[in-house]
Amino acid sequence: SLTRYDDILAAYKDVRNFSSALGVSLYFGQPQPDRSGMGRTMILTDPPRHAKIRQVVSRRFTPRAVAAYEGRIRQIAADVIDSIAEQGGCDFVVDIAARLPTAAICEMMGIEREHWDLMFTIANQTVGRLDDEYAMGRSGRETMLDAQAQASEFFVKEAEKRRRNPTDDLISILVHGEAGDEPLTDAEVIANCWLLMLGGQETTRNAISGAMLALAQHPAERERFLVNPSAPAAIEEFLRWTSPVTHIMRTAMSDMRIRGETIRTGDRVVLWNAAANRDEARFDHPDTFDITRAPNEHLAFGYGEHFCLGAHLARLEMKVMFEELVRRVSDIEIAGPIERLRSNFVAGIKHMPVRFVSNALPEPKPVSAA
């Protein structure tokens, strides 16, 4: 395990000696046979193949492209909040934090509204494979494989629709895209559809939920935040503080020594993002939640070749959601026990009851999110 910021940063940069191809999480010790029909996602590939797959969809996630989505993202956030604002309270995770990113990525992928609940369920079972609520008596491996099988069945059908009738959504871009000078394989298309659907939901959902909890637990910072909920520094501190993806795993491709410890070829090396983001050698007072922290070069989105493709989208969704919450809800407080996700990979909250008082607003608009 690597826990120091500088060591983790160096490993992220060194794609020659630290491979992603043999797994990126601690869920399973060794790669397992795949019964889902999926190929390799871009996060399970090394250069040069990784960059070739990534460039197929990357233009939809540039800062300029993401900025063009802001109006729609803001409308979704407003609809979500308006739909529950008069209820007096809700499960913040399920009713608010999850609905914006689920709706946004599904719309970008061209997934019809009737299937959004399925996408939410598949995401929960994938990241919550070790959690009893989502495993429902199955082993973690079986829960994961069942989720993959559901996703594969769905995206095979969606990909076939795009082959017959190309569109402008992300699924169609993958179906008709070329990685370098050759098309993606059918299995790669399905795998990367699943990855976009999963990644598009989880990081933002957990960052929004974790940020809301942090604001509730730190009243002074909450008051500062309410004065300027659009401050970029606050979003970066939310990400550092919550570290939604706790670790990323790599496989050593050569013998090496790090801080006096020997790492052999084939050893699994775990990069603990959450520890790096609290490293006192990098951050002043790292255990202090400070929404004005600067600089704040956290590793919540990783670094280098595998830097999170959706980082700009996640930041925008967080910014818009909190701006709309501040505008539409005058007060929010935790109203009951918080249930955390059982996972060593995702720092997630499953359920967080809150109570709130709504600001006076026009009649709610029709709900357009999951």
PLM-predicted stretches and their roles:
Residues S1-A370:
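Cytochrome P450
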